[in-house]
């Protein structure tokens, strides 16, 4: 389903109605309010998710401080960057050049060397004699992965050379652990219908799980890491942290690269800390966490989500916008899923659809402050887009919020009526209700460049948003559906398939994992950008899917985070690399 833009008809001019509000005033098209404390006398009959308080309080955020000061290392960092650029020119061997590009990217340094990486890949893509031999499995697989990852048109037919006369991959390949690992990673960038890559994935995963003998410990570590989750599915900033530590263990590491990666990670971490402090103050001033006690207060978790989706340091404004959106989505989701009655939710959905401050008059007290927070924050975001890029984005932002609330109300009606949707019916609504289109839509207009509206209706863009959101939804369902159904929520994808196909939960879970694989294939086809300016959105779409795997890999990392989730937050936001 393509996102359709509304005809711009929204006006910032409204006649406010201060009904039952203590204070109401406009500030730059924004309404600030304090509402009388909501009554909880009607708690009887309302559901509860029993969410625990966040592991992170404002004191943790405000005391975040890194000893690392980039200004103290500026000249050294410039020298290291010069060393790396010189190295990229010095290396002549095509395989070594590709390995260097791969290492730079995995260390989290790709954004610093975009121009140089593009030059290398252009040379490789246009050279008909990149390799004198096509028998090097590692080289062929690495070339395929890098080119496809960067949007070049590349065929997987080269892998047929590694098959025997019976049509299967040669058993002799099992001795080449490095090549097998490269093929395994490359297989996760497949498109639908690329059977050879499906076969490659099955072949490599089976044999890599069974490796034994005297194997290089660093290579073995990489194999186990990839089998746990392939690189293409991993949250890239956490992956950079892991790879920096792993690269340190390699005998052939380049000292300049290793040093630069640590300095860059620490430098970017200080940017994240500054942004998180600003977001924490915004959330505290907004007051929703205190007013709506039934909802999840997950500001740090939302910021962690955001850094996974938009991690390049230059997109600080976009991270701020997306953090606000993520926390509002989390709150409104709890209004629909946990607290609101069907009658109240119908009113709230109508109010969002109208996008008029007067629509608040019909809402109960707890919804007024929620609606006003949504209205104000969205208008603030739109004001920045108008001021910085000259774009009136209100019609589009209103559209994605309305679509989200309408998808929520569909699920609320299903729950109220005891209706069990088919899997297809559920997913057609659920890829919207997971809020991926809201997140990516806001991100698109916050990258700091003038983005054309019509690009959001390109088939490639619509497909990216849908399949990224679908992966998000299915990963969420695998981790959270049991708890949500136990508290009386609408059946999720697992339960829908169980009812429809008459299978066990275990079989249904395997089917959902299969759907995730298929969604990745469809999304991989979006790697080729129709226009260059869409690249930040393409990156964000893929990173949204990666964050879904990260957050829901070991349970509900958003609603009920565990010690592993806590450790990940600390690694990304609080623990810099130490220098001797």
UniProtKB/Swiss-Prot annotation:
Mg(2+) 1 binds at residues 333, 337. The keyword Transcription does not apply. Its EC number is 4.2.3.-, 4.2.3.110. Its main location: plastid. It comes from the Eukaryota. GO terms for biological process: diterpenoid biosynthetic process; green leaf volatile biosynthetic process; monoterpene biosynthetic process. Pathway: Secondary metabolite biosynthesis; terpenoid biosynthesis. Residues 1-26 form a transit peptide. Mg(2+) 2 binds at residues 333, 337. Monomer. Belongs to the terpene synthase family. Tpsb subfamily. PANTHER family: OS04G0344100 PROTEIN-RELATED, TERPENE SYNTHASE 12-RELATED. This is Alpha-thujene synthase TPS3, chloroplastic. It comes from Litsea cubeba. The gene is TPS3.
